[in-house]
Curated annotation (Swiss-Prot):
This is Acidic phospholipase A2 2. Its cofactor is Ca(2+). It comes from Bothrops asper. It catalyses: a 1,2-diacyl-sn-glycero-3-phosphocholine + H2O = a 1-acyl-sn-glycero-3-phosphocholine + a fatty acid + H(+). Transmembrane segments: none annotated.
C-alpha cells in the first residue's frame, strides 16, 4: 500500500524522503499526465505503469510483506499472495530507481503542477 511504499522508499534511501516525492514532476504523486521531466519523474511513470498492470488486488491499499537489509540495501518481497507480491515488486523497483537517480532530483519540479504537464503521455 502507499504507506508501505513510503516506508520502503525511506528504508532504501536511508532517510525520510516521502514528502520530497509526494508531488514531483508530472508523475510522482496521485496519477500522472504528460511527459516525465527527468529520471526521477520517470521512476514514478514506470511505477504508475506497474501499478496499472496489477489485477486482483489494490496497489494503493492492500498490505504486503517485505524485508529490508540495512547491511546491503536489499529489499526482498515476501508472502504467498502473488498479487500482493506484484505490488511489492512495483514499489521495490521504484524505491531503488529513486535511490539510483537521486542526483537527478531537481527542486524546480517539486509541486510542479499538472498545468505544466500538457504534452501527450507516452504509453506504458
Amino acid at each position: 500500500n502507499l504507506w508501505q511504499f513510503g516506508q520502503m522508499m525511506s528504508d532504501v534511501m536511508r532517510k525520510n524522503v516521502v514528502f520530497k516525492y509526494l508531488s514531483y514532476g508530472c508523475y510522482c504523486g496521485w496519477g500522472g499526465i504528460g511527459q516525465p521531466k527527468d529520471a526521477t519523474d520517470r521512476c514514478c511513470f514506470v511505477h504508475d505503469c506497474c501499478y496499472g498492470k496489477v489485477t486482483g488486488c489494490d496497489p494503493k491499499m492492500d498490505i504486503y510483506t517485505y524485508t529490508y537489509s540495512k547491511e546491503n540495501g536489499d529489499v526482498v518481497c515476501g508472502g504467498d499472495d502473488p498479487c500482493k507480491k506484484q505490488i511489492c515488486e512495483c514499489d521495490r523497483v521504484a524505491a531503488i530507481c529513486f535511490r539510483d537517480n537521486k542526483d537527478t532530483y531537481d527542486s524546480k519540479y517539486w509541486f510542479y503542477g499538472a498545468k505544466n504537464c500538457q504534452e501527450d503521455s507516452e504509453p506504458c
